[in-house]
From Swiss-Prot:
Organism listed in the record: Escherichia coli (strain K12)
Name of the protein: Sensor histidine kinase ZraS
Regulation: Activity of the ZraS/ZraR two-component system is repressed by the zinc-bound form of ZraP, which probably interacts with the periplasmic region of ZraS.
Keywords: ATP-binding, Cell inner membrane, Cell membrane, Kinase, Membrane, Nucleotide-binding, Phosphoprotein, Stress response, Transferase, Transmembrane, Transmembrane helix, Two-component regulatory system, Zinc
Reported modifications of this chain: Autophosphorylated.
Record topological domains on the Periplasmic side: 36-201
Superkingdom to which the source organism belongs: Bacteria
Modified residues (Phosphohistidine): 254
Membrane topology: Multi-pass membrane protein
EC number: 2.7.13.3
Amino acid sequence: MRFMQRSKDSLAKWLSAILPVVIVGLVGLFAVTVIRDYGRASEADRQALLEKGNVLIRALESGSRVGMGMRMHHVQQQALLEEMAGQPGVLWFAVTDAQGIIILHSDPDKVGRALYSPDEMQKLKPEENSRWRLLGKTETTPALEVYRLFQPMSAPWRHGMHNMPRCNGKAVPQVDAQQAIFIAVDASDLVATQSGEKRNTLIILFALATVLLASVLSFFWYRRYLRSRQLLQDEMKRKEKLVALGHLAAGVAHEIRNPLSSIKGLAKYFAERAPAGGEAHQLAQVMAKEADRLNRVVSELLELVKPTHLALQAVDLNTLINHSLQLVSQDANSREIQLRFTANDTLPEIQADPDRLTQVLLNLYLNAIQAIGQHGVISVTASESGAGVKISVTDSGKGIAADQLDAIFTPYFTTKAEGTGLGLAVVHNIVEQHGGTIQVASQEGKGSTFTLWLPVNITRKDPQG
């Protein structure tokens, strides 16, 4: 069963790592496809309008060419242009000179007026090949304008006209090579297609961005869930250990303490009756000391596993830290260890059990003193941190190996030849009961720093520590 659960967890971790990459790749590919295809439909509509405009222009040129051979008058050309302008989708038709003055127009009233100014004609630069532009709205209809030089006669025809015989004594009229022809066709469908393409592309890109964002957020949320679940599993394991220890401690306390009291009493009895300095006296003292040690182990075990009842009150941390340092000052001075702490007047009072916090600090100090041995420094700092306070205890001792850092708060884990291995477990338990956290940073040979975070109000807890 456990193997199957591990397999599922491994598969879930693998999928959580690979799926976001796959989704991002697919979204990127789809986005490139959408962007690449953008404008294809509108381009097809535009080409259809251009072709329509060019066909009508060529038709007018052909009609004019035939008319020249038949000596077509201006009025007849105007009529031909008006007839062609009546084709479906044609908004207007015009022929201008090089200065933009209208020579022919689908609206006869506009003949002789300026369609465009000379400057505008310079910018338009009509050429032999057709050009186009969108005019926006002509009255109420969006228009696409197709224009080029008006060429009713190709170059060979123009060259031949100079040598043509006169008809009835008159030459066939020649056309100004700089005349330009303009046709405006209805571009409503083109504009609608462009708007639809833009709207659809934006919708698709927005949907892709939403999918991408959701995938990224899901990835981080899932990773956060995995971390939270792992923390909960670790916490459950620790609680299970404490429950087991609780049952063990209850049995040990019941079965051992009464005999221990008898053993200690007998040891003192024999010590008092044995000659001072003799072997029997020393053995009796060793028995009494070991009985005390075993009784202390049982007491610490009970302290660890029994429910902690906090006597909460407003605590001035500056006062509490100074008091706790005084309790270990004699031991520290005997080892030539300096104790350093500077009061921080900006610290807020916190709701806590002062006796329990003093116990926490004393355990940390005693561990630091044992880690230093002789000649060193223990520094204590306190500062405000978010909705709580942070207390750091730093020593110049031998440090903790990296592979041991994760186990130092485990009951009965110790790196010392002497000790029960319950001190830091008790510290962790008390800090947790206060709604706080404790972390350790250490390098072997460079000392250690234990950092406590405690909320100002015990109902609040900093999840990040």
